[in-house]
Amino acid sequence: MLRAASRAVGRAAVRSAQRSGTSVGRPLAMSRPPPPRAASGAPLRPATVLGTMEMGRRMDASASAASVRAFLERGHSELDTAFMYCDGQSENILGGLGLGLGSGDCTVKIATKANPWEGKSLKPDSIRSQLETSLKRLQCPRVDLFYLHAPDHSTPVEETLRACHQLHQEGKFVELGLSNYASWEVAEICTLCKSNGWILPTVYQGMYNATTRQVEAELLPCLRHFGLRFYAYNPLAGGLLTGKYKYEDKDGKQPVGRFFGNNWAETYRNRFWKEHHFEAIALVEKALQTTYGTNAPRMTSAALRWMYHHSQLQGTRGDAVILGMSSLEQLEQNLAATEEGPLEPAVVEAFDQAWNMVAHECPNYFR
């Protein structure tokens, strides 16, 4: 049961404070709870996945353990990491929580990714090396979901897919996922896998939020056609949709965050830090005040409620939102927002207007 899992995480947090190393926890016998359902007659809302990119960077082992525990205690069960996150520290921390990840009776699901960056590739040897290294860090025999983090345009995709099929046959992962691929590449991959009898991808992880909707035009119809679930990352545009930033902030010294003080900061600024984007956020904030008055929800809450109630995500198809965090407090606030109801029509319309303001400079969902 997830309560047992969260207790195991709590014990791991205590251990991490007592010593610098991590220890292997005994696999936990847990039965998966039914997914949370909306009120009678309402559509099933998308699932929530915990993004762990900040574990090992802005969150140490103890804070990470507390966040995983809080996530599990709210009835969620999917964790998302990657080979490259914090140079492997994200996976190491998750592996030390004693969850029994990858065991047959563990209902806490774990996903990781292999990438073609920083000397890596999606050639067979590199894919195998990355996945097997991830399994060692996570202290598990297999992962539930194994993504190709982005296309490797220097490697024939057939080589990559054949290698993935071999690893799947060896029992090293359950489901295959894609991330940051163009819709035509998804169609090509699904066709190749089907014609060769290789494992088919079943999940796509992509960039999607209230002011970044490029996936709606072509990618989502492609995924529906081939039967892939869609997991949305950057639901708050890297934190821009919290409303806490001003456009002029880029010119001064800022605290470490998604947009400042890390190796990916420039990528995130190029992706979202546009003057029109800040104007669009101001428009939504004005609509919130006009519509709700003194009871207006925070911008963060409104952006997440848009994802769960007004986006093109479909809970009945297994779609999900990936929630990252840099602190336990932030996670708890965001989880609370995911449980709130739909927005008033005037605010939904304001989000649509905001999207129209920034659509011309929307970052590509593919790489």
Curated annotation (Swiss-Prot):
- Per the record, where are the segments of Low complexity compositional bias? 1-31
> Is Zinc set as a keyword in this record?
no
Transit peptide, UniProt annotation:
1-46
Phosphothreonine occurs at: 48
So what does this thing catalyse? 4-hydroxybutanoate + NADP(+) = succinate semialdehyde + NADPH + H(+)
Which Gene3D superfamilies does the UniProt record give? NADP-dependent oxidoreductase domain (3.20.20.100)
For this protein, the record's CDD domains field holds: AKR_AKR7A1-5
Keywords in alphabetical order, please: Acetylation, Cytoplasm, Golgi apparatus, Lipid metabolism, Mitochondrion, NADP, Oxidoreductase, Phosphoprotein, Transit peptide
Region entry Disordered: which residue ranges?
A: 1-45
Q: Which residues participate directly in catalysis?
A: 85 (proton donor)
**Protein localization:** Mitochondrion; Golgi apparatus; Cytoplasm
GO molecular function annotation: aldose reductase (NADPH) activity
Q: Which GO terms describe its biological process?
A: lipid metabolic process
Q: Which residues carry this modification: N6-succinyllysine?
A: 244
Cellular component annotations (GO), alphabetically ordered:
Golgi apparatus; mitochondrion; nuclear envelope
**What is the annotated role of this protein in its UniProt record?**
Catalyzes the NADPH-dependent reduction of succinic semialdehyde to gamma-hydroxybutyrate. May have an important role in producing the neuromodulator gamma-hydroxybutyrate (GHB). Has broad substrate specificity. Can reduce the dialdehyde protein-binding form of aflatoxin B1 (AFB1) to the non-binding AFB1 dialcohol. May be involved in protection of liver against the toxic and carcinogenic effects of AFB1, a potent hepatocarcinogen.
- The name this protein carries in UniProt is Aflatoxin B1 aldehyde reductase member 2
Q: Which organism is it from?
A: Mus musculus
Gene behind the chain: Akr7a2
